[in-house]
Amino acid sequence: MKIFLCLIAVVFLQGVVGFHVEREYAWKNISYEGVDPALFNIDNIIPTGFVHDAINKKIFIAVPRRSPQIPFTLTELDTTKHPERSPPLSKFPGSDKLINVYQPVIDECRRLWIADVGRVDYKGDEQKYPNQNAVLIAYDLTKENYPEIHRYEIPSKIAGSNTIPFGGFAVDVTNPKEGCGKTFVYITNFEDNTLIVYDQEKKDSWKISHGSFKPEHDSTLSHDGKQYKYRVGLFGITLGDRDPEGNRPAYYIAGSSTKLFEISTKILKEKGAKFDPVNLGNRGPHTEAVALVYDPKTKVIFFAESDSRQVSCWNTQKPLNHKNTDVIFASAKFIYGSDISVDSESQLWFLSTGHPPIPNLKLTFDKPHIRLMRVDTAKAIRRTRCEVKPRKP
């Protein structure tokens, strides 16, 4: 037992100190730049997703409208103007009519994609935010004020249930060197356990169902000494390296599962194709996650785990099992990892909301609970089981 406790202590110490975390934003509560604090409720400002534009040094952060008094559901943080630890968020200049956004994604053409679910997650504001079909929108980050350049309304029969069931999503530009027109978007639905595929060129969408999308068991969230059960299906998806034909492995996870699956995007891009994924293996007990990301530089997938308060890794060049996974960050302060991404400069970013999805959860705001961390991917895996060193000649 003493050895076990010592190992836990070492992991937590290294997670905070030893893995070269180069920047940390930490908020007790989030404010909006230029907005009277009386117009919003700080208790409700809980971000769930983000993405970093390494060229403009800006972070786009989604603050879903789960509760009233949220001025903007998509925000912007200019890291050059706000080097402070707890900066305010600014209104996203591309649109002021968004209803409810959970995650932004940047593709290789520097388009910012969002999936606006079209409804708020509470009752009482129907006139202000009337229910609409979910919509995919792309903005051009290369131009001032990010003009909208693409919009697609997802049919209700494809989007799924009447709640807000979207998890993560991935954008697949088939061949960026030849242009951006041939693009597919893959959106997870964790309630219906389906994967939505959108073909930008044909402006068509369809959904895929499969047993691997379903939750495997009840998952546990720990908070204030109590344990809460939850059960969610397909949630996270990330894309690997392209082959010469522009196809890539799509890696996906259910939120209540520790297995990782792979399917070729060649199958996803063909409407009606036989869906036959590969079960890559099991990451081990208590490693459930709702977000994952592939880093092309290191060939590593990183997982923001839901309850363990850690970020783990697996090198895709090795078989997947608990002996080939490792922890690159752990901290008691990293409460509920909700999103993780790698930017164009191979910087790994990960977000904890401090707000696990527990009904009627009451938070105190006496210390920072929302955290956004950054670390270079190569440094993150150094001296871990996820590092694969080149063979000596």
Curated annotation (Swiss-Prot):
A Pfam family name for this chain? MRJP
| Family recorded in the similarity comment | Belongs to the major royal jelly protein family.
**What is the recorded function of this protein according to its Swiss-Prot or TrEMBL entry?**
Probably modulates blood feeding of sand flies on vertebrate species by binding and sequestering different mediators involved in the host response. Binds biogenic amines. Binds serotonin with high affinity. Poorly binds histamine. Does not bind dopamine, noradrenaline, adrenaline and octopamine.
Q: Which top-rank group of organisms is this from?
A: Eukaryota
Q: Where is the signal peptide?
A: 1-18
Q: Which residues are glycosylated?
A: N29
- What protein am I looking at? Yellow-related salivary protein SP03B
Main location group:
secreted
